[in-house]
Amino acid sequence: MKKYLAYTRKLADATPETRNRVVDFWRVVAILVVVFGHWLAASIWIKPDGNIALLNSLEWIPYSAWVTWLVQVMPIFFLAGGYANARALAKVENGDEQRRDWITARMRRLFTPVVPLLLVWVGLILIMHTFVPAEIVYAGAMAATVPLWFLAVYLTLTALAPFTFAWWRRLGPVTVVWLLGAAVAVDVARFVFGLPGVGWVNFLFVWGAVHQVGYWWSSLDLRHAVGARTGRWLFAGSLATLIAITWTGLYPVAMVGIPGAGATNMTPPTVAMFVLGAMQLGIIWATQRAIERFTSKLHSWHGIVAISAVIMTIYLWHLSAMSLFAAGGLFAFDGAFFRIEPGTLAWWLTRPLWLTFLVAVTGVLVSLFAVFEWRISRRPAPNKIQVVVVGVLLTAGSAAAVSTIGIATRDAVVQWSIPAAALAGAALLGALPRPRSHT
């Protein structure tokens, strides 16, 4: 830990003056909300009859659908991603770097840490299948790998970034309008004409529109800092719009999935999710000066850098930590920790202990696997763009399959085609972890 803190302290000290620390701050805030939100939402209960119930805390929290407006922070990742990609694409726009090389480098950085996650869970499924009930193995593997939906979408948007950014440079905010128009058309087909399957296209249209707004944010920052007043107006307008389209029933209220609550704006995303993202951008702009002062302090900035350096590992492994702890807790001391009925006072009083355990387990996993965020292949990118395209399709497609179908069947049998596709895509892109250097 001391070595890591010393390393990140050097990174913090070497931060260029041109870096927008506000973007990093909100990315860290978002990952913490995601992690603790997932942990608090999870409820495991061994009922008096011995049956195991896997529940969601939002099922009994009052006005839980409205609460999701506070905890749904995925738009921040796409806003920050668009901002960062706009800055990183400068070399491509100037002709100093080929699109193929840029895409390959980004795919490696994003997918290399995913490879050990998939391999570990294939191994765990094979081992646990011999002595753990199949339904528990399936639920644990599914819970641990469902965050890969984000990687599936983000890998796709990043692979398209050289083209969508060039589109932005030509047409500017019109690109957001085009994507929003497409998303509205999909929502109409889904909710008015009863074609739910069409809604899945909005993973690209809605999140693509948010990503384009990230380009917009970056271009505004290059000219002048956006004022707090603009942020307040954007927040107020977006909030009013969000209330209007949900209160009138045009869109669901919930921004995350709530069991038994029906349709949500999350899976697949709707235009309401874009409006939530605009509201969050309003908050970012309105508080920008205060956050700049906070991040200018060395200790504050060092903390942000320390988390940012392992942010992908935290995201990928925080639910594995929960699954592994839960699997052990179900058998330790006759499952005493999980015999408390969820939603009761006793259950809420044990949440700090639950979170403490999960922070500890996640810390161990991060210490083991964070190295794969840095052990990125240095070999040249594929010579042909077709190879890169196939690699992107295989990696993004396998991530989507893992998060929706599962890496294992309900009988806890590994679906070998999925990890095979992931490894094949990683091999094509050079996204397999680089061997440890002994020099």
Residue ranges and their predicted role:
Residues 2-439:
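Alpha-helical transmembrane segments and their immediate juxtamembrane cytosolic regions
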